[in-house]
Design a protein with these regions (language model features):
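Conserved ankyrin/ankyrin-like repeat signature
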Residues: 153, 157, 194-195, 262-263, ...
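Ankyrin-repeat boundary/"N-cap" motif
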Residues: 132-145, 172-183, 209-223, 234-251, ...
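N-terminal alpha-helical scaffolding segments that mark the starts
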Residues: 2-84
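Ankyrin-repeat intra-repeat helix-capping/turn positions
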Residues: 150-153, 191, 259, 292, ...
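Alpha-helical protein-protein interaction/assembly modules
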Residues: 146, 300-303, 307-309, 313-316, ...
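Ankyrin repeat domain, specifically the short helix-to-loop turn at the C-terminus of the second helix
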Residues: 121-129, 159-172, 197-214, 230-238, ...
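Hydrophobic alpha-helical transmembrane segments corresponding to the first two to three helices
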Residues: 385, 391-587
Length: 589
């Protein structure tokens, strides 16, 4: 995240030079133009013959099939949008062009698509009314310009245009910056419920998706790529959803994010689905969590939006609130989902569903990294601490008393025993031998035995049994750590065996935990407890000690033993965190 870049398309830059676009002579981006002047005179004189004639003669040449529209393959539209991207993101047909923005002709190899072909594959084609080559600088039509200026004069002109050419209503912006934005989107942004109703009555598509660069989260803009397989844009799934106008792509989501309840209800009444998901998998309720619209959230939920849909990051509205640390929204959704058993005054007895809250998946029994509790505990914002109240803290206390407390004390007792055994092992170790003595004996005993053993394994020499017995006698006699004559040595050897078995069991338990949690989550858990990391390292080193013992590498073993002791003892800090009086000191250390 944070992977953002500035991407101002050439069309946006060209809007300043409106004289190059024929469309702007009829209606320009400032609300002027030939048709605007005619419409003003028509409204004043109540004579519409002049404006009607101008629409028929001046607008119709800009349309496909005199306003009847034409089906365009989505693959051609994707190429038209893709030519505005940087060269390394261009699709293969455009990479060979020196200047794709000027050389690419969208009308080359256009097939004649019948109604039957469109009905068989509606996602493969888009019906357009306004000629692609006669559009504005950012792919807009005359209808977009009328609605964009948000005046009663231009609204009347827009209605007049739709009276003659009704199929213009579903034309969208074609440039990458605003791709997919329809007049319905613009009207919602203008907060004009009356015009929204008119457009819906005129047949506006209430499921049109607006996924232009301008409406994309900031940290996803650099990852935008195109594909011939579909019309929408591919983006990286990892995002923080921060965007100036990231409002969920659909008109219904636009209305919800902008708090336009009347527009929302109008669109919903026409059959719009509030559970439709945008490129990030977000529904209306996800978007309301992002923008913390509590009142609108209640309204959307009451009229049918679902709380159980997961987005691309596998987050429901509740878990999304937990991840983004939207404290008010989180507790609000929790209260919506709870089941109240009884209520007396300010006292309430309620049950909370745990399927999205608890770290244990209710279906698989595995750890859910996308649970609300896990997202809050591993959250990086200060606001995540505010979420550890009420239900979550009660859940943690219940889990502690039911499942963890006994195991924690048992682990503490077992580790204490392990540590005491390690003290016995390393306290009873004999001191170092006289300088030079051990090195001489090793060279005179181990070397020949090893060489003869290697030859024996190749079938060239048979080593007598008495020779091996002699090697063992030499090893036990010359290596101080293999001498079992005294009772202290026998106790030490027995304790070392116990310690080795204990280390093996600890390593095995860690491997089982990693298998259950998954490597990523296991490493995340270890990163929060450095003392446990040190202890596991000491266990691994303990498993290596027998090899050094058999080779009589006493100096190396002594060094390793010191490291083992130094990395074992700090594990007590983990268990000390149980007591509140020393917990702060433990965390500081």
């Amino acid at each position: 995240m944070g992977n953002t870049e500035s991407n101002v398309t050439s069309g946006v830059k060209k809007q300043a030079g409106t004289s190059e676009q024929k469309l702007y002579k009829l209606v320009d981006i400032k609300g002027g133009g030939l048709l605007v002047d005619m419409m003003k005179r028509a409204l004043q004189n109540k004579q519409y013959a002049e404006i009607d004639h101008a629409i028929k003669t001046k607008v119709e040449p800009f349309l496909y099939n005199k306003g009847k529209g034409r089906y365009i393959p989505v693959s051609h539209l994707v190429l038209l949008r893709n030519k505005e991207r940087s060269r390394h993101k261009l699709l293969p047909p455009l990479r060979g062009m020196e200047n794709p923005d000027e050389e690419f002709d969208v009308e080359i190899d256009w097939p004649q698509v019948t109604q039957e072909e469109y009905d068989a594959n509606p996602l493969g084609y888009r019906e357009l009314c306004w000629d692609l080559k006669e559009r504005g600088a950012v792919g807009e039509t005359i209808l977009h310009l009328c609605i964009l200026n948000a005046s009663s004069l231009l609204a009347n002109l827009a209605k007049r245009l739709l009276r003659f050419y009704p199929k213009m209503i579903n034309d969208v912006y074609m440039s990458d910056e605003y791709y997919g934005e329809s007049v319905l989107h613009i009207t919602i942004v203008n907060e004009d419920p009356t015009m929204v109703k008119f457009l819906l009555d005129a047949g506006a598509d209430y499921h049109e998706r607006c996924y232009g660069n301008f409406m994309c989260p900031e940290d996803q803009k650099a990852s935008r790529t195109d594909s011939f397989d579909h019309e929408w844009v591919n983006v990286q799934p990892d995002t923080n959803y921060n965007g100036y106008v990231y409002w969920g792509e659909y008109p219904l989501s636009f209305a919800a994010c902008l708090g336009q309840e009347e527009c929302y209800r109008l669109i919903l009444a026409r059959g719009a689905d509030p559970d439709k998901q945008d490129t990030n998998g977000n529904t209306v309720l996800h978007m309301l969590v992002i923008y913390e619209k509590v009142g609108t959230f209640d309204m959307a939920y009451e009229v049918g939006a679902s709380l159980n849909i997961r987005n691309v990051q596998n987050l429901t509205p509740l878990t999304l609130a937990a991840k983004l640390a939207r404290t008010e929204m989180f507790f609000h959704i929790v209260n919506i989902e709870r089941e109240i058993y009884w209520q007396i005054g300010a006292t309430t007895c309620a049950a909370y569903p745990l399927d999205q809250v608890d770290t244990i998946d209710t279906e698989t029994g595995l750890i859910s990294k996308d649970s609300a509790l896990n997202l809050v505990v591993f959250g990086e914002k200060d606001e995540h601490l505010d979420l550890l109240e009420g239900m979550l803290i009660d859940l943690l206390k219940t889990k502690w008393n039911t499942f963890v407390k006994f195991r924690f004390y048992r682990q503490f007792i077992l580790f204490t025993c392990y540590f005491l055994v390690s003290l016995v092992c390393f306290t009873l170790r004999p001191g170092p031998p006289e300088r030079g003595l051990n090195a001489t004996t090793i060279n005179s005993t181990m070397g020949p035995i090893v060489n003869e053993t290697e030859l024996a394994s190749e079938g060239e020499l048979e080593v007598p049994v008495n020779k091996m017995e002699g090697w063992w006698e030499d090893l036990t006699g010359e290596c101080r750590l293999m001498n079992f004559d005294s009772w202290q040595a026998k106790v030490r050897i027995f304790a070392e065996l116990l310690l080795w078995v204990g280390a093996l069991m600890y390593v095995g338990a860690a491997l089982r935990e990693a298998r259950f949690l998954g490597i990523k989550m296991f490493i995340e858990n270890l990163s929060t407890v450095p003392s446990r990391v040190m202890f596991l390292i000491s266990c691994l080193l303990m498993l290596v000690l027998p090899t050094l013992r058999l080779w009589c590498a006493e100096e190396e073993e002594d060094h390793l033993a010191v490291i083992i002791m130094l990395t074992t003892a700090p594990y007590f800090l983990f268990f000390c965190s149980l007591w509140k009086t020393i917990n702060c000191l433990t965390i500081t250390l």
